[in-house]
Amino acid sequence: MDFQTIQVMPWEYVLASQSLNNYQENHVRWSQSPDSHTFSVDLPGLRKEEIKVEIEDSIYLIIRTEATPMSPPDQPLKTFKRKFRLPESIDMIGISAGYEDGVLTVIVPKRIMTRRLIDPSDVPESLQLLARAA
């Protein structure tokens, strides 16, 4: 059986080339507090209209850039897209985003879980019998 030799491309050299990688990589910073998750990304030089924040299937947060008709035709398009899986315990209605001084900040609030104490005298007699039987 003959095996063909596969030539491996030196990707680290090609991708590190300045001509192919004109823009610095945008890193998304994530932090968590007791009340929310916060995503921050530096997107300098963009207008608010060029940034899209979307929720897909109530599971994923997508942050991306999109060229608009007002974008100067002589400028190369800068594209950015990141997709994050959201935890189940978030408040979908309370998600907010803001873009100021070239920094996009998306705040995803956590759903407030409250525990309710049940007074045994409030439990109907039929449920008390079921609890004892179990």
UniProtKB/Swiss-Prot annotation:
InterPro entries: A-crystallin/Hsp20_dom, HSP20-like_chaperone, Small_HSP. It comes from the Eukaryota. It holds the Pfam family HSP20. Disulfide bonds: none annotated. Residues 19-126 form the sHSP domain. GO terms for cellular component: cytoplasm. It is found in: Cytoplasm. Keywords: Cytoplasm, Stress response. Belongs to the small heat shock protein (HSP20) family. May form oligomeric structures. This is 15.4 kDa class V heat shock protein.
